[in-house]
Amino acid sequence: NEKAGVKVTMLAFVVKACVMALKKFPTFNASLDGDNLVFKQYFHIGFAADTPNGLVVPVVRDADKKGVFEIARETSELAKLAREGKLKPDQMQGGCFSISSLGGIGGTTFTPIINAPEVAILGLSRSYQKPVWDERKQQFLPQLTLPLSLS
């Protein structure tokens, strides 16, 4: 809702969807501590943010307790701080699961690299229209690749 000062992007919805998936598949809401798998009881979701100095991963804490608008506002604020080089270390630590989006630069597929010590990361590619033909007509169907890297 831009009138309320919040631009809602697909990332906010993907964060919420990831929380729902992590609740259903808690094995992926974990991190590695040496040889031990540590299961998390909270949902801190990181997202890759491109900065002039490279990628950083700010973390939306307790994403399960926030709505889409609140997540949209927070990801926007964290991304702005990242671009300005003003993120604090605690704003980039403690994630359980991360999202890496390549859509902004036009990629339709890639393999995201896990943000250690997390055990999984979701890639968000750019959507596109795929031509599909049947015996009667040609149509274009929306496609979106969501690669998931697991450890």
Positions of PLM-derived features:
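C-terminal catalytic/motor cores of large multi-domain enzyme assemblies
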Residues: 1-151
